[in-house]
UniProtKB/Swiss-Prot annotation:
It is a single-pass type II membrane protein. The gene is ftsB. The chain crosses the membrane at residues 4-21. It holds the Pfam family DivIC. GO terms for cellular component: cell division site; cell septum; plasma membrane. Residues 22-105 are periplasmic. Keywords: Cell cycle, Cell division, Cell inner membrane, Cell membrane, Coiled coil, Membrane, Transmembrane, Transmembrane helix. This is Cell division protein FtsB. It comes from Tolumonas auensis (strain DSM 9187 / NBRC 110442 / TA 4). The keyword Membrane applies. GO terms for biological process: FtsZ-dependent cytokinesis. Its main location: membrane. Residues 1-3 are cytoplasmic.
Length: 105
């Protein structure tokens, strides 16, 4: 009877070891679950970004307002008759930073 109990304890220990540390065990399950949650969060962020990009594409396809806005903001275009003022931030010495745009005469 003692030998039978000892054999059962060894078998139980082996099964527990396999459950906790073996392939597809609880430790690996926890790691895979955490990885899955991270991937789902990344996918959600990417889906939101894709939606914004799709909206931008539709705006660009449908009207000139979005194109005009991009040209004004990114390329510095101005309409004829407008006056453009650029406000430069101050650097750490308290002086205005110089613009990288060439001066026009």
């Amino acid at each position: 009877m003692r030998l039978f109990t000892l054999i059962l304890m060894v078998v139980l220990a082996l099964v527990q070891r396999q459950l906790w540390f073996g392939k597809n065990g609880l430790v690996e399950y926890r790691q895979v679950s955490e990885n899955l949650l991270r991937r789902q969060a990344d996918n959600q962020k990417l889906q939101e970004r894709n939606m914004l990009l799709k909206e931008d594409i539709e705006d660009l396809k449908s009207g000139l307002e979005a194109i005009e806005e991009l040209a004004r903001n990114d390329l510095g275009f101005i309409k004829s008759g407008e006056t453009f003022y650029r406000v430069l931030p101050r650097d750490s010495a308290g002086q205005n930073k110089q613009s990288s745009l060439p001066k026009s005469d």
